[in-house]
Amino acid sequence: MTAVSQKTHTPPANFLLFRIAFAVFLTYMTVGLPLPVIPLFVRHELGYSNTMVGIAVGIQFFATVLTRGYAGRLADQYGAKRSALQGMLACGLAGAAWLLAALLPVSASVKFALLIVGRLILGFGESQLLTGTLTWGMGLVGPARSGKVMSWNGMAIYGALAAGAPLGLLIHSHFGFAALAVTTMALPLLAWAFNGTVRKVPAHAGERPSLWSVVGLIWKPGLGLALQGVGFAVIGTFISLYFASNGWAMAGFTLTAFGGAFVLMRMLFGWMPDRFGGVKVAIVSLLVETAGLLLLWLAPMAWIALVGAALTGAGCSLIFPALGVEVVKRVPSQVRGTALGGYAAFQDISYGVTGPLAGVLATSCGYSSVFLAGALSAVVGILVTILSFRRG
């Protein structure tokens, strides 16, 4: 009877999970489309420094960090669906600020300020979206399949980066920054329409500790996740300028290589954290990420840099679900949304801090040096993971 019941209910649950993941893909294009364009816009069109490029990219993630606690409480207390849909709306509003930056006849400083406002709104929306969809998906398929939920969401996120990066550069080069802004306004509305009828899941009853008390349970996997995040942050922030400084074409396809390898790994091996546990998977993944970043650092030509980006994407792919499985094991169900929000915040902090610091490093030592810094961070991540879980 149990087997029959599982066969009856698993396909609908998986289909609902697919709908949620596809909506994440559409909404996260608001991150993927402008990611390679913003450094070029800030550096070449507005005339600001590499440090300001890092701030423009990284400040989104600080906004995400600061609203993770709110997103987790919203998902836990009022329902994950509300959090996810609210995030989609905010991501669409970010495009409106960028449209103003593109069209208003104002100074470069005002345009930069409007760009920053849009990035802050996008960061707020991202925290609601990702915390909501993760908690929503686990409510649909159960915590025993938490690795699958995180894998599907990750495929959607990095699939959006893979598709969005070259598309964003194409839109910007042919139609300008205003067209890019309009596109980012429209995609979350499509996601809302596609996802709005998916059933909501009830909030869990029970005592709800604060985010900071939950952090005490999750900081070890969170630290490993943060050190992993440096690699993606330096690629996302400086790969366009790195390629331009070397006279290489296809900068947008570097993020496609990263995202494509990321998604492929999730598709082929996303089951591994649930099957083998997160620690072993995380250590191997960090080794692969290290190799990819070293290849980017030493790349003498564009195609080798593309291979390095793909290796980095393959390495980063399974780390979030691998260490996330350890998070789910450590917390009660009624604070799962808060815990996942806090866990993801470690990665957001990494992204936010890396941008400006890598900008200073790039100015002093050249763009290639930021990839060496990412590789060293991944090595430290391996050591931290081994030491943190050595008794497990």
Swiss-Prot record:
Keyword set, alphabetical order: Cell inner membrane, Cell membrane, Membrane, Transmembrane, Transmembrane helix, Transport
Keyword Ubl conjugation: no
Protein's cellular compartments: Cell inner membrane
Coiled coil: none
Membrane topology: Multi-pass membrane protein
Residues annotated as transmembrane: 22-42, 46-66, 88-108, 121-141, 151-171, 174-194, 223-243, 252-272, 276-298, 342-362, 369-389
One Pfam family here: MFS_1
Major location category of this protein: membrane
SUPFAM superfamilies according to UniProt: MFS general substrate transporter
Matching CDD domains: MFS_YfcJ_like (cd17489)
PANTHER family hit by this protein: PTHR23517:SF1, RESISTANCE PROTEIN MDTM, PUTATIVE-RELATED-RELATED
Family statement: Belongs to the major facilitator superfamily. YfcJ family.
Protein name: Uncharacterized MFS-type transporter YfcJ
Source organism of this protein record: Salmonella arizonae (strain ATCC BAA-731 / CDC346-86 / RSK2980)
Encoding gene per record: yfcJ
